[in-house]
């Protein structure tokens, strides 16, 4: 730990200072004895005379023995103190492993170590919670994916079984059942494709084939392509796109980002409402997509882009979405040096996209 060295230095300083003071006191004793001995005339009948005479004749030996005892005593004392600190730290480490939920408390001399160990404990608890949440989201995704795979697959099997077992069906009904089975199979293909794509983005580094792209033109083309879908829900575009906004991006992947965002906005918009798309270039390139829909709770906003998080636990498939479009969009934007965020209030949903300006700008 980074706080061990100051504690060791402190103990060593105390050890040497204490030893030095005691040795200085020891050296002064012979001087005091000599001073006392010289203050008067002593007689052999006085008991203290023999003591003074003993120290006067053997003062060097006495000082050496005293110095040895001082060194031995202070060394034992501070070694015991250091071992006590070590044992206290070992016990705290054991507690950190066996009882991570319990706060660590050490003696006042180890307050810095205590704070650092408690910080490690908190981080470990946070990591454990995050790992459990991630594992739970993965388990939920498997359940949801199995449900979403089974639903269209069941429909495909059902309609194909009808076609096989009902030879008397009219051509019109056969065509209708075939068309429905094809639509369900296409949804199944889309779901599997997006699931593998988000998994690939999470496990590998996204490789970008960058080029200079006119975002203004790209967004205009995308909005035109979505007109049939907008007409189905009586939605309409409100565009505020700055002209000639260039960006160095992977054109195909960035188009995928805006395709996902627009589909999401269409799926979750109220009928007969506008979709506002804005493009502005300032210090960075900013794209904002606004639609009218059910307000997203604040606690769910930050988790919209998590691959294994679902806001709607019921997993209604009325929108025909896979639920993986937003995580894919964020992965692409982060790899492109940009970012994405969302906000929602008063039945309005806003997605904000930021991209870096080209280096030559």
Curated annotation (Swiss-Prot):
Ranges where the Histidine kinase domain occurs: 144-359
Its membrane topology: Multi-pass membrane protein
Gene Ontology annotations for the cellular component aspect, listed alphabetically: plasma membrane
Binding-site residues for Mg(2+), renumbered to this chain: 252
Keywords: Antibiotic resistance, ATP-binding, Cell wall biogenesis/degradation, Kinase, Membrane, Metal-binding, Nucleotide-binding, Phosphoprotein, Transferase, Transmembrane, Transmembrane helix, Two-component regulatory system
The enzyme's E.C. designation: 2.7.13.3
Main subcellular location: membrane
UniProt modification remark: Autophosphorylated.
Catalysed reactions listed for this entry: ATP + protein L-histidine = ADP + protein N-phospho-L-histidine
Compartments, as annotated in UniProt: Membrane
Residue numbers carrying Phosphohistidine: 147
Superkingdom assignment: Bacteria
SUPFAM superfamilies: ATPase domain of HSP90 chaperone/DNA topoisomerase II/histidine kinase, Homodimeric domain of signal transducing histidine kinase
Chain segments annotated as transmembrane: 16-36, 59-79
Keyword Transmembrane set for record: yes
InterPro entries: 2-comp_sensor_kinase (IPR050351), HATPase_C_sf (IPR036890), His_kinase_dom (IPR005467), HisK_dim/P_dom (IPR003661), HisK_dim/P_sf (IPR036097), Sig_transdc_His_kin-like_C (IPR004358)
UniProt entry tagged with the keyword Kinase: yes
Gene Ontology biological-process annotations: cellular response to phosphate starvation
GO molecular function term, any single one: phosphoprotein phosphatase activity
Induction remarks: Expression regulated by upstream promoter elements. Part of the probable VanC-type operon associated with vancomycin resistance.
Xref: NCBIfam families: HK_VanS_ACDEFG
Protein name: Sensor protein VanSC
Organism field: Enterococcus gallinarum
Gene giving rise to this polypeptide: vanSc
């Amino acid at each position: 730990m980074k706080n061990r060295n100051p504690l060791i230095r402190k103990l060593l300083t105390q050890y040497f200072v204490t030893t030095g003071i005691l040795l200085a006191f020891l050296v002064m004793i012979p001087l005091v004895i000599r001073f006392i001995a010289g203050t008067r005339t002593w007689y052999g009948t006085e008991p203290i005379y023999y003591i003074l005479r003993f120290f006067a004749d053997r003062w060097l030996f006495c000082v050496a023995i005293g110095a040895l005892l001082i060194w031995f005593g202070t060394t034992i004392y501070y070694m015991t103190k250091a071992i006590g600190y070590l044992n206290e730290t070992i016990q705290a480490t054991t507690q950190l492993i066996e009882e991570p939920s319990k706060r660590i408390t050490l003696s006042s001399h180890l307050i810095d170590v205590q704070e650092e160990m408690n910080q490690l404990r908190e981080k470990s608890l946070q990591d454990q919670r995050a790992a459990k949440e991630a594992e739970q989201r993965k388990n939920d995704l498997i359940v949801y994916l199995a449900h979403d795979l089974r639903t269209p697959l069941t429909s495909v099997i059902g309609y194909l079984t009808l076609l096989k077992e009902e030879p008397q069906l009219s051509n019109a009904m056969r065509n209708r059942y075939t068309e429905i089975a094809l639509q369900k199979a296409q949804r199944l293909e889309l779901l599997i494709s997006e699931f593998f794509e988000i998994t690939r983005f999470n496990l590998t580094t996204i490789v970008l084939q960058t080029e200079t792209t006119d975002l203004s033109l790209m967004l205009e083309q995308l909005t035109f392509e979505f007109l049939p879908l907008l007409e189905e829900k009586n939605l309409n575009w409100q565009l505020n796109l700055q002209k000639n906004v260039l960006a160095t991006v992977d054109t195909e992947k960035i188009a995928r980002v805006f395709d996902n965002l627009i589909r999401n906005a269409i799926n979750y918009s109220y009928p007969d409402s506008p979709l506002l798309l804005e493009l502005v270039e300032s210090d960075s390139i900013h794209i904002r997509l606004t639609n009218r829909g059910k307000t997203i709770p604040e606690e769910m906003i930050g988790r919209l882009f998590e691959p294994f998080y679902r806001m709607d636990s019921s997993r209604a498939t009325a929108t025909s979405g896979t639920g993986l479009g937003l995580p894919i969009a964020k992965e692409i934007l982060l790899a492109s040096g940009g970012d994405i965020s969302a906000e929602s209030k008063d039945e309005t949903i806003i997605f904000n996209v930021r991209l870096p300006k080209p280096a030559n700008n």
